[in-house]
């Protein structure tokens, strides 16, 4: 009897030791697709929405621990192509013709598809006016017009893809989106005279008209290894470098890491989509400006995903007023900065305007109450983490505002010196 008992215990230990972790398939898949991952880096499975990366051995400062090709994105339509501005230009022209909201991540294949997507966006944003809207008569044509192939919709992952995405933001986002779409479909069905769609079909088309489907935040998290873009920024042990030429992302350690220490963790349901409102202004990347105000990697990537260059751009009514105002201010900033070419540094109005926009963004945080956070992140499991990150953002903003103020003062002093010098030269010439 004892023999069987010990045999049973031993078999359990053997099975635990030899069983695959949720990330064995992920690591194997990555290495088969040109991923480099240091043999000193390990992954811990926390639950389906959380995972962490830790040091298997001591790691020196500035050590390359990952080299991630863009091609490892699980998005079926290779969403990294959205980073290519050339591809965006033609689509953006179609958007402008339709006065289509830039808040929509869908890039239509044709003008007809863009028009129908606009209808769907309008109707779903104004459900109580569903019957009254002039677009109502077109609504049922959506089913026949859009592609029905699920390969076109990155929200719908295959079982094998879902396994690879265990612990990533993309997986929990898609789950929450599906719940949201089902709720929308049921609400529309209640106020409609006839049923124009079923829930599954509606979910596919609704996928086309939400920023949370194809925006840069979700694109990066669809790469199973790049959930560090969504990590808690309070404890950065790693740094990222975007290699645009080879389309790779390098991950380095920022300081010596001890064996067993966590390098970064993907925790909770907090998205960086707010950072576009705060930092994502397009600007002329002059050397001095970059040194004075380094914008996070996520914002630099966002600038490539959304092109804002039309001062007459009209926004759909469903766009948040704060975003609407901020986009326009950011556009003005870009236009000002693009004209910054005076050697004497006298034209610093662009930087002052940027500072004003930055301060305005900071005020948005002050007006954000705890109830606002609970409402926006109502399904978040860790509200305290959200509040903690927002607090970090406030401090980060204050720091950068201070740096930018000093930079402006420096420009003013240098400009005044040059002006004084030129003034003296002119006086000497007059004499």
Where are these regions (language model features)?
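Well-ordered mid-protein domain cores that form the structural environment of catalytic cofactors
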Residues: 33, 81, 85-158
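Long, positively charged leader/targeting segments at protein N-termini
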Residues: 20-72, 76-81, 127, 136-422
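Short acidic, low-complexity intrinsically disordered linear motifs used
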Residues: 426-430
